[in-house]
Amino acid sequence: MRMPRNFSLIDCIRRGEEIPLSAFAQGEDEITRQVIEYGGLFPFNLARMQGKVFFSPITTKPRPMTVSEKIFARHMVNADGGVGVEAVKPGDTGFTRVDLRFSHEYVTPMAAIFYEHFVGKGVPVNDRDTIKFFRDHLTFLDEVLSEEKRKMGLLDLATQLKFKQQDFAKDQGIQLHCELKDRKGSEGICHSVMLETYALPGQVDVGSDSHTPHVGAMGCIAFGIGTTDVFNSWITKDVRVKVPGSVRVVIRGKRKPNVTAKDFILALLAMDYVRSGKALAKVIEYAGEAVEELSVDERATLTNMAAEIGGFTGIVAPDEKVVAFLVERRGMDRAQAQMLIEGLNSEPDAQYSHVIKLNAEDIAPMVATPGDPGNGKFVRDLNTPVPIEIAYGGTCTAGKNEDMDMYARVLADALKQGKRVADSVKFYIQFGSQETRDYCVRQGYLEVFKQAGAIVIEPGCGACINAGPGVSTRPDQIVISAQNRNFPGRSGPGQMYLASPLTVAASAVAGYITEYEPAQEREAVTA
């Protein structure tokens, strides 16, 4: 339950006074008031399924809608209990039917305990085939956990989480993407696998992680939910939502050869509008020719890091790039893929909370200096050379196929010049999924990584959450990483700079933070 908006209630609580539930519901929407009065989401949903509660249906008249509003309109539960309404607008509140639900080992066990307690052990979940579980966050925890924390029992607790999720998945017949049988590592990070295998244009998908918007690159609405919503969604196959407003980010022009989607998002995060929190809880809709030119993998970097903006989700309207992804990487029939994206665009007169315009030609390779992803600045504007000890390329944000293309491009270029990873640097490259690892094998990248001196790691969240190789171990240790967050302590006690895969790899070779200079540009300068 959220804190009441009437802060005078805090004094009443301290005095031990009796407070009517209605006092906590003041200023809330109709559904939230009823959830509070019923004592929580589960008893409310139970009453809803028994036909004991009523709330006003969404009655918004047809209006020009954004792509996210169109998707919500198709999925909102209507007055008849079916799915779909004529239109929605920001502020409309109701329940949205969800297409896919996923959770990982941090959340599944608690949700499973709630489910078995309130619903019953062995009682089937609603539509188990659209629920996916993942063991990805803590796969490599034992490699970095200190002896002190082991003595506290943290490794044992992590193991208990693993087994609880495993047992619940088996009891329910739910697919669990877990650890590899023949070597250490996971099948894949939840977001990576959801993008590669499951998410489709036009869906509403929910997951137990803030970076669930990753799959918005596919042209779907995807957002993170907490344990209570996860558990309830297993019963109802819907979640409560207030339709958010949208911020449209238009990136025009042609980017430089050493600029990537990561540079775009770091530039966006550094803007006053974003840093001041004005984009909080909004849909971040990316558009413009520079976005259209990006692959689905690169678009996922933008949608993934809508979380760092504080957005509700991130989305790119699906186009031929998405169709090609579905055909080439999933083997889908082209006509079927084309049908999925039909009508999934924002209408010209759709209303936005705000529009941000960027010129790709003005953006150079970026870093976010230690402490916050919003501390963005151009690499060229760093006052002095910044020596590094660790370079890390991986995570959901930067462990995709195209990210591996970038690491391999820089390292292959270095090898041609007789260079490799600097002796003073450990460069870790971690795959986002087994599909990406297999891609690297086919492309011959593993040999490039090995020859260049990089340390290759099987899939898992790992260092990004301070739970795997690549974490810092000293406060004075400087790290450059392609991950999405560099908050203090996020990946160890060191000082972390965020950057693109190109910049991370180039810095690993140089031994200090530097831009990647493509070979053709160097040749042109030399000539």
Enumerate the predicted regions with their spans:
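Fe-S-dependent hydro-lyases/dehydratases of central metabolism
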Residues: 1-527
